[in-house]
From Swiss-Prot:
The gene is rutB. Keywords: Hydrolase. The keyword Transmembrane does not apply. Belongs to the isochorismatase family. RutB subfamily. The active site is at D22 (proton acceptor), K131, C164 (nucleophile). CDD domains: cysteine_hydrolases. HAMAP family: RutB. Hydrolyzes ureidoacrylate to form aminoacrylate and carbamate. The carbamate hydrolyzes spontaneously, thereby releasing one of the nitrogen atoms of the pyrimidine ring as ammonia and one of its carbon atoms as CO2. GO terms for molecular function: hydrolase activity, acting on carbon-nitrogen (but not peptide) bonds, in linear amides. One of its GO terms (biological process) is nitrogen utilization. PANTHER family: ISOCHORISMATASE-LIKE DOMAIN-CONTAINING PROTEIN, PEROXYUREIDOACRYLATE/UREIDOACRYLATE AMIDOHYDROLASE-RELATED. It catalyses: (Z)-3-ureidoacrylate + H2O + H(+) = (Z)-3-aminoacrylate + NH4(+) + CO2; (Z)-3-ureidoacrylate + H2O = (Z)-3-aminoacrylate + carbamate + H(+); (Z)-2-methylureidoacrylate + H2O + H(+) = (Z)-2-methylaminoacrylate + NH4(+) + CO2. It comes from Azorhizobium caulinodans (strain ATCC 43989 / DSM 5975 / JCM 20966 / LMG 6465 / NBRC 14845 / NCIMB 13405 / ORS 571). This is Ureidoacrylate amidohydrolase RutB.
Length: 227
């Protein structure tokens, strides 16, 4: 049983995955896209440490670990042109239009910005899922990966709470997945109030909210699944 708000949730190891959302240099490192675009990334360091604890506990318990990587091809065809809302709303794309010297650097596959941070390198058995939009369910193999493994419970951590994390958790709700947000293993893009708003939305409408400590305790009590 995982302690959570608004109530505890029963989670079986074989039906659970930890979903690490967009822990890339773009979102968590100085000189990455969010930093260049003017967002406060000071909370990213704590999030990295908390996520490292989470995935360590997950692997020890036999819980599937899935990483998202957000971005596009180096020519940004996958990002969409002026006919796409993403072209207008993506702060990475807007930043590159304002600063043409950055063209081809932000969230481009194969580049430093796109890469996962060194502290959270995937391990053997982990799954990495590329995604081209905020929600990890859109135009990706994520749903198929989950259904093939019988996974129903998604434990979310990563950046940004109010954008890609919440977008994916919401879509999961509509696809009948149980979404759990580890509030102390996330960081928002924007002021502190958007973090609180995202947590409120999850707890009240779309899922459950827990902590890294509660996750670690809950899964330490569950024997690892056998191969």
């Amino acid at each position: 049983m995982l302690p959570a708000r608004p109530e505890p949730l029963s989670v079986a190891v074989e039906e659970t995955a930890v979903v690490v959302v967009d822990m890339q240099n773009a979102y968590a490192s100085p000189g990455g896209y969010l930093d260049i675009a003017g967002f406060d990334i000071s909370g990213a360091k704590a999030a990295i440490s908390a996520i490292a604890e989470t995935v360590e506990a997950a692997r020890a318990a036999g819980v599937t670990v899935i990483y998202f990587q957000n971005g596009w091809d180096k020519d940004y065809v996958e990002a969409g042109g002026p006919g796409s809302p993403n072209w207008h709303k993506s702060n990475a794309l807007k930043t590159m239009r304002k600063k043409p010297e950055l063209q081809g650097q932000l969230l481009a596959k194969g580049g430093w910005d796109y890469a996962l941070v060194d502290q959270l390198a995937p391990q053997p058995g982990d799954i990495v899922v590329p995604k081209p939009r905020y929600s990890g369910f859109f135009n990706s193999q994520f749903d198929s990966i989950l259904r093939a493994r019988g996974i129903r419970n998604l434990v979310f951590c990563g950046i940004a709470t109010n954008v890609c994390v919440e977008s994916t958790l919401r879509d999961g709700f509509h696809l009948e997945y149980f979404g759990i947000l580890l509030e102390d293993a996330t960081h928002q893009a924007g002021p502190e109030y958007v973090q609180k708003a995202a947590i409120y939305n999850v707890e009240t409408f779309f899922g459950w909210v827990s902590t890294v400590a509660d996750f670690r305790r809950a899964f330490a009590q569950i024997p690892p699944k056998e191969d």
